[in-house]
């Protein structure tokens, strides 16, 4: 593992899946997981890293699944947006309990619950050392929270989008099905598309590619992995315009 003395990133957009908050519960939010994530984010803030956060809603609701069962997709996606707000409220509370100043913003109006997303305010809050949680996706149906993460990452001029998953990075195949699958340490955007690797949905991925924002995929369940990524160590998979070095 390579070790850098200084953080590799100044400002990040951290994308957490809703499923990551479930832990072993199978549904909803596991308070132990929430508190652990809050502590890891706190460690970054204490290092001077500016942290924007997008959380999915799959632990509470999945609009696409109900759309297949007959529900109007727009309605389903709107319910999914509200699920991300619920997760955002839970994470804000966990961060406040960890004594981390945090602001929750929503892409849709929810007066009395959280403030409406405003780009300039978000930048100011990040510069002042607050964690900013971006909820309700992009505010539009048919767009995933991965798209929201890339969009907000580009808007706040983040140095990278860090996608926290349950696996150690991007593999050549599903490691659950093939234990011999190769874990990539680095990939180019084009290689991901050519190999049809599942990193995030195409709309989100091409948005990141077109705006040249690197994507780091890592295992959030691995202790110290988030800090390792921030320090620029060879943790997980980094995706950028740089071609992969063949070994």
From Swiss-Prot:
Principal subcellular localisation of the protein: cytoplasm
Enzyme Commission number(s): 2.7.4.22
Q: Name one GO molecular function term.
A: ATP binding
In residue numbers, the region (Involved in allosteric activation by GTP) covers: 23-28
User: Which residues of this UniProt protein bind UMP?
Assistant: 57, 77, 138-145
The metabolic or biological pathway listed in the UniProt record of this protein is: Pyrimidine metabolism; CTP biosynthesis via de novo pathway; UDP from UMP (UMPK route): step 1/1
Q: What EC class does the entry list?
A: transferase
Q: Which reaction does it catalyse?
A: UMP + ATP = UDP + ADP
Q: Which domain of life is it from?
A: Bacteria
Q: Where does this protein reside within or beyond the cell?
A: Cytoplasm
- Binding-site positions, ATP: 15-18, 58, 62, 165, 171, 174
- Tagged with keyword Kinase: yes
Activity regulation text: Allosterically activated by GTP. Inhibited by UTP.
**Which key words tag this protein in UniProt?**
Allosteric enzyme, ATP-binding, Cytoplasm, Kinase, Nucleotide-binding, Pyrimidine biosynthesis, Transferase
Q: What's an example Gene Ontology biological process for this entry? A: 'de novo' CTP biosynthetic process
Family as reported in the entry's similarity comment: Belongs to the UMP kinase family.
The function of this protein is:
Catalyzes the reversible phosphorylation of UMP to UDP.
Outline the subunit composition: Homohexamer.
- What is the name of the protein in this document? Uridylate kinase
Give the organism the record lists: Colwellia psychrerythraea (strain 34H / ATCC BAA-681)
């Amino acid at each position: 593992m390579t070790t850098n003395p200084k953080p590799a990133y100044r400002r990040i957009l951290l994308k957490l899946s809703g499923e990551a908050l479930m832990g072993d519960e199978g549904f909803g939010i596991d308070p132990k997981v929430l508190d652990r994530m809050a502590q890891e984010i706190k460690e970054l803030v204490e290092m001077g890293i500016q942290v924007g956060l997008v959380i999915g809603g799959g632990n509470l609701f999945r609009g696409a699944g109900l759309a297949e069962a007959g529900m109007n997709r727009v309605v389903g996606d709107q319910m999914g947006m509200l699920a991300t707000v619920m997760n955002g409220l839970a994470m804000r509370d966990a961060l406040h309990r960890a004594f981390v100043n945090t602001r929750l913003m929503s892409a849709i109006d929810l007066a009395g619950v959280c403030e409406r997303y405003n780009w300039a305010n978000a930048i100011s809050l990040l510069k002042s050392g607050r964690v900013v949680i971006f909820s309700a996706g992009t505010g539009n149906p048919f767009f995933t929270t991965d798209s929201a993460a890339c969009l907000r990452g580009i808007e706040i001029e983040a140095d990278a989008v860090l996608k926290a998953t349950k696996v150690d990075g991007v593999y050549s195949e599903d490691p659950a099905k093939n234990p011999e699958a190769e874990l990539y340490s680095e990939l180019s955007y084009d290689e991901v598309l050519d190999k049809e690797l599942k990193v995030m949905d195409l709309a989100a991925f091409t948005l990141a590619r077109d705006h040249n924002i690197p994507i780091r995929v890592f295992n959030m369940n691995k202790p110290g992995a988030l800090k390792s990524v921030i320090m620029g160590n060879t943790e997980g998979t980094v995706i950028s315009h740089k071609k992969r070095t063949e070994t």
